[in-house]
């Protein structure tokens, strides 16, 4: 399979039995998805992990879109109703209320938005409004899923330290 674009979200100590015991080892394994001359979007990550991925990308002539450099996002709203402000790819999107709960979803949405904007030239129906609508309507059962309003009852399937930290932050 030849991708049109690749994305690597944050790097955390997860699946260490398969990917490695350090962030650098895990980053190296995740960089395995990079393909020669195919652009890649990197989420916010540990500087050491990012250096590893940047080295692998340079070796494959992979154009990178990096959090905080080629694009950025500001967090707003509340944990149950996060609001994204995005700047990147020559565009600005303000006050996008995400369908997914959790402030960490702002980072995930910014990655997805960057990927989608890069694909617009290949997919004419992938308009700015369609992308924003998708972010607003997205749902993920089991991820900060509201089961009851009164009293408030939430369910989450966090299973690693990074996921648990995001859950606590929410």
PLM region spans:
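Nucleotide phosphate-binding/pyrophosphate-handling subdomain across enzymes
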Residues: 1-7, 11-12, 16, 25, ...
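Flexible active-site lid/hinge loop adjacent to a nucleotide/diphosphate
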Residues: 1-48
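Extended acidic/charged loop-beta regions that coordinate divalent cations
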Residues: 1-18, 50-93
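Generic secondary-structure signature for well-ordered alpha-helical cores
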Residues: 31, 35, 55-63, 118-124, ...
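Conserved beta-strand segments of alpha/beta enzyme cores
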Residues: 39, 63-65, 152
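Conserved beta-strand termini and adjacent loop/short-helix elements that scaffold enzyme active sites
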Residues: 43, 67-69, 147
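Glycine-rich beta-alpha junction loops
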Residues: 46, 70-73, 100-102, 159
């Amino acid at each position: 399979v030849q991708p049109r674009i690749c994305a690597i979200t944050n790097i955390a100590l997860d699946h260490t039995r398969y990917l490695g015991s350090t962030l650098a080892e895990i980053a190296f394994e995740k960089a395995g998805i990079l393909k020669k001359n195919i652009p890649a979007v990197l989420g916010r990550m540990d500087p050491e992990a990012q250096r590893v991925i940047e080295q692998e990308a340079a070796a494959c002539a992979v154009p990178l879109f990096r959090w905080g450099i080629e694009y950025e996002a500001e967090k707003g709203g509340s944990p149950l109703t996060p609001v994204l402000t995005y700047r990147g790819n020559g565009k600005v999107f303000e006050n996008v209320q995400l369908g997914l709960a959790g402030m960490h979803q702002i980072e995930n949405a910014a990655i997805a938005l960057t990927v989608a904007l890069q694909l617009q030239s290949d997919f004419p129906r992938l308009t700015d409004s369609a992308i924003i609508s998708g972010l607003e309507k997205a749902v993920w059962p089991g991820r900060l899923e509201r089961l009851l309003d009164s009293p408030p009852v939430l369910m989450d399937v966090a299973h690693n330290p990074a996921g648990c930290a995001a859950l606590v932050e929410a």
